[in-house]
Amino acid sequence: MKITLKYFGMIAESLAKQEEELSMEKSQTVSDLRDQLEKIYPKLKSIDYRIAVNQSLVESNYSIQQDSEVALLPPFAGG
């Protein structure tokens, strides 16, 4: 199964990319994906970030489905 990963802000700068496709053998939770990405990109371990799937912030037990768009979002402030 394939998903599209999008990186923003300091995450995109740290990884030197804004987007990529990732193949996964099966459906994974957000927590599983986070673990996998932190093995591929150890720099992510030192960055506080949230994960959104299909433009909605999700919890760590959310199951990611085929063709999902997954965004890694650094801390942000608004008002």
Regions from the language model: what does each represent?
Residues 1-78:
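Ubiquitin-like/PB1-type beta-grasp interaction modules and other compact soluble beta-rich domains
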